[in-house]
């Protein structure tokens, strides 16, 4: 395996399509229509030379030396050998991280304290919400004269951007009945609720100017890709620089892939953007409830750790990630309710296919055994 290519990308490319499509983190970024992968690239220096060589690839430049590239797997392997390339990783699937009403977010308490003590209201600051859209006619996002507080809006689903003047013109036509539909409509309600909490007139930053990015489609999938978030962050910061205003960017999405230690290109991009301009990037965490999708423990050399995994009926697939330090050795064994065993060790690391009841996920209690040392 090429050390400059993320192992999940290499594993996903080597996995059969019917299996890969069952795992969102493996399938994210692959376009079946042209057999190309969308990848995130961290670079050192200019890519002018590389772009002149890989003419069939599509390059999108982001801030801080990051690029999003669409190309074939063969070109990815060749690209990884170029001296300008530091690392390549694939997009991951992200999901909503906020399902709370304004009262549950303690906004009412914050507003009461703001009134009592004369707290900050966000005046002169931009609040950017990267989410599922916005209802631009909502009074929460209008000023006292009925004009929009949104300075710019980018709808990734259509590729169209709107200025505040264009939004006000659309609103006037909508009120007069000249138009029946509004751009960037939030059909899920998630983005609207997030924006109300963050920068609505009854929200926290009630006097802030607003930037909205409606995230694009993911080929009919129920998730958003990290690359869509990265493009949104890039857009918001560039606009803040153009307006000469500080910006607070809200991202109420999250995922379960990775070690969550800040070592992925996506996480490093967020960190680097924070030091590029006067900006703060806020990302939601938690929201797992009783899902209990994460677990951590400590292993002692020579000991065996047994953990149970409860898998419900009709689960089409299950993705298990075990993260450890590179210098530690561990032998991992999965025991199905049927008694079948799958042993994973350093010797057979990589892509391993194992049939259990003709590839069906067996519901019940699975046992994960880890031998350390």
Model-derived features: positions:
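A general sequence property marking short-to-moderate contiguous segments
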Residues: 1-18, 281-301
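Autoinhibitory N-terminal propeptides
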Residues: 1-67, 74-116, 126, 139, ...
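Conserved short loop/turn motifs at secondary-structure junctions
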Residues: 63-70, 253-259
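Stable alpha-helical elements in mature extracytoplasmic
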Residues: 75, 190, 194, 229-232, ...
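Structured segments of extracytoplasmic/periplasmic soluble domains
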Residues: 82, 156, 197-200, 232-235, ...
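Subtilisin-like serine protease catalytic core
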Residues: 115-227, 244, 248, 278, ...
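Substrate-binding/access-modulating region of protease and related hydrolase catalytic domains
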Residues: 217-299, 314-342, 349-373
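Non-catalytic, beta-strand-enriched accessory regions in extracellular/secretory proteins
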Residues: 299-312
